[in-house]
Amino acid sequence: MNGLNEHKFKNIVVVAGAGISCGESSLLSLVVASGIPDFRSANGLYRNLNKYPVPYLRDPSTIFDYYDFQEYSTPFWILAKEMFYTNGQYHPTPCHFFLQLLAQKGLLRRVFTQNIDGLERKAGLAPPTLIEGHGTCSQCACVRCKQEYDPNVPQIAVNTRTVPFCSKCGGQIKPSIVFFGEDLPDVFYRCVMKDCPEADLLIVMGTSLQVYPMW
């Protein structure tokens, strides 16, 4: 921390995970939880799925399986209403604003986030400084023809309890988050290879680095 205060670092790379949203990170004692649950902790989504009105699933991770989504997307949309499309219920935490402060001071080279909640964007970060490795709920597109849609389409769908379909080809509209079975965006790998050798400080926040490709 002294190095930050003394402006010794000017090329900082950050790897961020769910802990900066749900309150598991302790960096600078800055965390005030946004209210969004994480996935794998003792209090996370996968171990507490019975709290949500989701049909029984043998494996909770199938909610985020690309091929299962195309066959039966109802569990995802039920959960998405509770977690992501909440009419502005969730807000950035001080950790998110800490990252934005680094950016404002010209010290931040890149943030690689595992989060899909879009709170980094709400705090003021944006591409190309922000790399959303697992995608974002802030955008959406048709799974079939890739037509992009207004990001409010999923919010309208969950409010009306409907599944959104593409007006062009009839395919399902899906938030632009990376499901199991999908590739990460190319920009993630390009920036990792470029940024890491040139960084003078790496900060890991809110992640155990156990999820591919962060480990």
Short names for language-model regions:
Residues 1-215:
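Conserved catalytic core of sirtuin-type NAD+-dependent deacylases
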